[in-house]
From Swiss-Prot:
GO biological process, one term: mannosylglycerate biosynthetic process
Entry annotated with the keyword Magnesium: yes
Name by which UniProt lists this protein: Glucosyl-3-phosphoglycerate/mannosyl-3-phosphoglycerate phosphatase
pH note: Optimum pH is 7.
Length: 269
């Protein structure tokens, strides 16, 4: 079994970024040795810090599917990848410089502002992140979160981005300019393939997310779980068999994983 999870609004509460209510299920999956693969729009440095707080060292997917990071020597797996420092990396995204070049070309016309245009203080105000975390959020490698003055312009912006080899996805707080060849679903496919090649079979997969950019991930797992937004409303997802958690954030995450583990132990899945 492999669990794939979004962070903000899913494992982490939207309002305070806490995973406190998910600790019972987190401890349970750790004891069982179940891999917990983070799939997020956050940066590598942000995820490294969160993994340390969670007490895990597992594969993770950053910046909306831009790259997959496996710890070197992970479970003795044989993985075709780029070796960099402590990681075995599979890259799907565009270089951040290319992303910024495109932003510079169109930002005045569409009145958009990306993280690269913002001070750390501005990011703190928009995200409620502590200053040191906002600094890590600004250190990007592949994608750009941005705000736009008039959301009616998004469709026109999407068309121009498409012609340049980019696309736009929507997270819980921001729009994101990303490479055309990436999304969370494609990155999840890669992780599943690595486990299959090394285990000899495809493991049962569970995915949890709350936003539009999580839909590609949810389409790639056996058990997709949709976490409600903080206002108790759900993202519109047309996906057969999707499970809707009752509560937002870490409480809904905990309840959903606890129930799935119970069902598996009873032989229901």
């Amino acid at each position: 079994m492999v669990i794939f999870t979004d962070l903000d609004g899913t494992l982490l509460n939207h309002e305070d970024y806490s995973f406190k209510d998910a600790i019972p299920s987190l401890e349970r999956i750790k004891k069982k040795g179940i891999p917990l693969v983070i799939v997020t729009s956050k940066t590598k440095k942000e995820v490294e810090l969160i993994q340390k707080e969670l007490g895990i060292e597992e594969p993770f997917i950053v910046e909306n599917g831009a790259a997959v990071f496996f710890p070197k020597g992970y479970r003795g797996f044989n993985i075709r990848c780029d070796q960099e420092n402590r990681y075995c990396i599979i890259k799907l995204g565009r270089d951040y410089r290319e992303i910024r070049d495109f932003i510079e070309k169109i930002k005045d016309k569409f009145k958009i502002k990306g993280f690269g245009d913002m001070t750390v203080e501005e990011i703190v105000r928009l995200t409620d992140l502590p200053y040191d975390r906002a600094e890590l959020a600004k250190e990007r490698d592949f994608t750009e979160p941005f705000i736009i003055e008039d959301e009616k312009d998004i469709k026109d912006l999407e068309e121009i981005a498409e012609k340049e080899g980019f696309k736009i996805t929507k997270g819980g707080r921001f729009y994101h300019l990303i490479g055309k060849g990436q999304d969370k679903g494609r990155a999840v496919q890669i992780v599943k393939k690595v486990f299959e090649e090394n285990y000899g079979e495809v493991p049962l997969t569970v995915g949890l997310g709350d936003s539009r950019n999580d839909i590609p991930m949810l389409r790639e797992v056996d058990i997709p779980i949709l976490i409600p937004h903080i206002n108790k409303k759900y993202e519109s997802v047309n996906l057969p068999g999707i499970i809707k958690a009752e509560y937002p954030g870490s409480k809904g995450w905990n309840e959903s994983i606890w129930r799935i583990l119970n069902e598996i132990e009873r032989g229901c899945c």
